Amino acid sequence: MRNPVVWGMIYFAVGCIFTYLAASSPGSMWSFYSILLMVFAAYNISISFKMFAFSFKIKKNQK
């Protein structure tokens, strides 16, 4: 379970869930709740991209 690709998929899925929750939150899009969820989503998606890049770097160094 230490594979960076698996963790990248998990972080990306959680980021998508946070994005969905922020988009479907009651009230306006500029409420504290929706902004907080979007911050969490951006963080998770950025971590997923870092995990995918790290996996590519590991595979490149193994050759």
From Swiss-Prot:
Pfam family, one: DUF4305
Transmembrane feature ranges: 34-56
GO cellular component: plasma membrane
Keywords assigned by UniProt, alphabetized: Cell membrane, Lipoprotein, Membrane, Palmitate, Signal, Transmembrane, Transmembrane helix
Membrane topology: Lipid-anchor
Record's subcellular location: Cell membrane
Signal sequence segment: 1-15
Listed name of the protein: Uncharacterized lipoprotein YdiK
Covalent lipid adducts (N-palmitoyl cysteine), residues: 16
Gene name of the encoded protein: ydiK
Primary location: membrane
Lipidation (S-diacylglycerol cysteine): 16
